[in-house]
Regions:
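Extracellular/periplasmic catalytic domains that process cell-envelope and extracellular macromolecules
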Residues: 9-13, 34-36, 65-66, 164-165
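Boundary/entry segment of secreted carbohydrate-active catalytic domains
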Residues: 1-25
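Short acidic active-site motifs
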Residues: 28-30
Length: 170
């Protein structure tokens, strides 16, 4: 409440916005978004991530240059949707994890969350809680835990709690 009371209207509006950008280092585009428009969230895509050292430095610069705490996110749900590809625990897709115990599922998502947090991320656009109601759908298929809504809900809940416990917002 105290922080909000000190913000201008422009800063409050900026905090509600999420932007992607081009590049792999802190550049003029990011400067304008963060320092001039005070946006609240940056999302990284594969085009922004080269290696662990680079993404750590980029995220550190984003956090340091922002006047207000930033959300820095990525889409790292596992399987074919992974943005950090090297030197991080491999996270299989949801279907591949469908036979894991609840404890195993929690551990792998929590470990992934801890690794993302070390790299400067505090938001992960996951889990996918799509129900695989059409096995021929090429977009959902292996990204779903099951064709049973209750199972998808339970597994997605475990993944979300594991990320939250690693201080990464799902």
């Amino acid at each position: 409440k105290e922080l909000l009371s000190k913000m201008t209207l422009e800063e409050k509006i900026g905090q509600m916005l999420c932007f992607a950008f081009h590049g792999t280092e802190y550049n003029e585009q990011l400067k304008i978004l963060i320092e001039d428009h005070h946006i609240g969230t940056i999302i990284h895509f594969a085009r922004n991530i080269e290696n662990l050292d680079q993404i750590y430095k980029l995220n550190k610069a984003i956090h340091e240059k922002s006047k207000y705490p930033m959300f820095i996110g990525l889409d790292h749900e596992g399987g074919m949707v992974r943005r950090v590809m090297e030197d991080i625990t491999y996270l299989p897709g949801a279907m591949a994890l469908s036979n894991a115990t609840d404890e195993e599922l929690y551990k792998i998502y929590n470990q992934t969350g801890k690794e993302l947090k070390i790299l400067g991320f505090n938001m992960n656009y996951m889990p996918s809680v799509d129900v695989n109601n059409n096995p021929y759908n090429p977009v959902i298929n292996s990204r779903s835990y099951s064709d049973e809504p209750n199972m998808v809900s339970k597994r997605g809940g475990i993944a979300a709690v594991a990320m939250q416990d690693a201080l990464v917002l799902p």
